[in-house]
Amino acid sequence: MARYRHSRSRSRSRYRRRRRRRSRYRSRRRRYRGSRRSRSRRRGRRRGYSRRRYSRRRRRRY
């Protein structure tokens, strides 16, 4: 939360775009909630997505 408040003035448009994309991803995720097979697939995909985002953020920070 504090981090977002700090970089809000800096990259406001970027945050808004990311937020919209996130909501879309969440709606798609909800659709595959019942299936067990897609559940494992979703888990792997989510891990890769978060990992990519984290590495990108880390690289930018330093």
Swiss-Prot record:
Disulfide bonds: none annotated. InterPro entries: Protamine_P1 (IPR000221). Testis. Keywords: Chromosome, Developmental protein, Differentiation, DNA condensation, DNA-binding, Nucleosome core, Nucleus, Spermatogenesis. One of its GO terms (cellular component) is nucleosome. Residues 1-62 are annotated as: Disordered. One of its GO terms (biological process) is chromosome condensation. It is found in: Nucleus; Chromosome. Belongs to the protamine P1 family. Protamines substitute for histones in the chromatin of sperm during the haploid phase of spermatogenesis. They compact sperm DNA into a highly condensed, stable and inactive complex. This is Sperm protamine P1. It comes from Lagostrophus fasciatus (Banded hare-wallaby). The gene is PRM1.
